[in-house]
Amino acid sequence: MQAASEVTRREGAIALTLDATAREAGVSKGGLLYHFPSKEALVQGMLEYHLEAFEQAIGKSEKPFVQAYVEMGSYDGSGGLFQSLSAVLALYPELLGIVRERSRRWYAQAKSVDALVAMLATDGLFMADLMGVEVVPGNLERAVLGRLLELAKEP
């Protein structure tokens, strides 16, 4: 998954091929095909890998789930990976069901309307960032994150 992620991050979604991933991983294409019989299977594996990594990072936080979600969701330290992954998913919209299922589980963690609003706002900010739209002026970023964290506090 790291090799596929690196190809996608470095060269963009269009460059993600089984050949490029095998080269990056230093394995034969046949070896890669044993684990991922198609590009779609590779994309699914990469998606599941990153969703799981996000959940594990939240799980390591000492904060309650929703507060950790807001903190983790407001930052994409992946160097453009999520933009590229989004582009790849456009080719395989059936894989969005994986994201929908995870999102349902995550949103179910919200115990109040305010907490849910904080999560939805976090997702909106993340999506705006994916599209390269700056919706929060830099001087207000901390204040907005602070307010979302206040909303995320469970009663």
What are these regions (language model features)?
Residues 1, 22, 27-28, 112-115, ...:
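Hydrophobic alpha-helical segments
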Residues 2-6, 10, 24, 41-72, ...:
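Alpha-helical structural segments
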Residues 6-41:
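Helix-turn-helix
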Residues 13, 59, 130-134:
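Short, flexible helix-adjacent loops and helix caps
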Residues 31-32, 46, 125:
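Gly/Ser/Thr-rich helix-start
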Residues 56-97, 108, 112-113:
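Helical hydrophobic small-molecule/effector-binding pocket
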Residues 93-155:
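Hydrophobic/aromatic-rich alpha-helical bundle segments in the mid-to-C-terminal region
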